[in-house]
Amino acid sequence: MNADEWFAPQSLSKMVDIACDTAADIVLPTVSLDRYDAHRERHSRVLDAAHISIDSKSSMVAGLPQLILGGLVAQTSGVMYSRPLFEACLSRGKAYRTVEFMAYALSQARFVSGCGDACFHAVAPKLTDAFDPTMYARISDDTRALDELADSLSEADSGGRLKLASQKFYFAGLVACIENLCLSPHGVSSIERSARMRDMLEAPRTRQMVAALKDNHRGLGLLFGPIASAKPARCVMCTHLAAFLNRTGAKTA
């Protein structure tokens, strides 16, 4: 846990109770992503873990898309692992508190449970505060880990739900990278910004995602078209337009 992360009262004991009662290898709390306004009032986005129960490959295929698309798979702090599973992940060289660690743990777990009554508080990501030149590399690594998990379950996933969830995870991460590049204060020149944008848009993983989602992109927002056409200038324009519409409360999808 980081210094600005915390459990609500009794949350940890409730997670321990679930782990003991169900012999769960992984217990996921509900996560509250908090931000504070100028008046120090808290505004939260809640990722609910109440309905998570995975005890087989078929239930993994059914439940994992919810973890991915709901955002919980990326919330790697505050998760409870059994000691044998935790040590197995470390022995494979998986870095703790990464999606890679979480994905490998999910692939090895016999039972995964959510604890809706436990709430873990974390600071909501602030994409526009500062430019992060390593962000795209992390998103790529995270998606690769989810792709590998989906591949390991491909026989049970005849409908391709995990692959689709992984594609949408990558799209959301790519949009976040574009927003960080376009909207954060930084000293990056317009030439470098365009070069970074083009590298992301022309990356093989991006083109794979576009091909996979071209017939299933409803609801993905303004940026799918510019990303699909690999036009950096259009991406910049639509990013600023989406930010303006979000501030005014208008819909962008």
Task: Please state what every model-predicted region is.
Residues 75, 140-143, 168:
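Alpha-helix N-cap/helix-start motif at coil-to-helix transitions, marked by capping-box chemistry
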Residues 1-3:
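Catalytic metal- and UDP-sugar-binding loop of GT-A-like glycosyltransferases, i.e.
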Residues 117-126, 131-158, 176, 180-206:
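Catalytic core of nucleotide-sugar-dependent glycosyltransferases
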